Amino acid sequence: MKNVLLIGAGRFGRHIAMQLSQLGHQVMAVDTNEERINDVLPFVTNAQIGDSTNAEFLRSLGIGNFDVCFVTISGSFQNSLETTSLLKELGAKCVVSRAERDVQEKFLLRNGADNVVYPEKQMAKWAAIRFTADHIFDYIEIDEQHAIFEVQVPEAWIGKSVGELNVRRKFGITILGIKRAGKTDVAVTPDTILSDDTTILALGEYKALQKCFRI
């Protein structure tokens, strides 16, 4: 269980709070808007109405006691930037800030953010890949070059074993697991036989995955 500070209780911040709550973490939420604070109360341990660009207010929260600080302020990049910088000055262990544009990501990293999330860009990329290829069921970006795809078993692979296909040698792709009837099996061996009711969880470089699965 981690102690988390969430600054910005808008839609994205509220979803973060919900997920953190489900994972069993202790969450303190901060926002300038009382209505947004009330909306997030069911998912947090504590909440305060306050201005995160005020150093004294942030200091009163005991920033050094939090394992992670999320900055999910919407509508004011200036406030997000100032808050990010102040958090690091006050000894924050890890600051994760939200960006809405590429240039914002660069400024946030320069001003103290340890990591930057860009939900609109990440969702756009996921949707573009997911819904333009009928045989792609899910997609997780690892970094700019690597991803995990959940993909339908190609027709030519049906009835063959993982070892027989040897996609690691041919494409540099690792089969992490397979899914059948909604159940995931990560105990994949070279003897695992692929069937037409199976999807594959494959890890590799984008170019290799695109070539292998004709994405």
Feature annotation, model-predicted:
Residues 1-215:
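Cytosolic regulatory regions of ion transport systems
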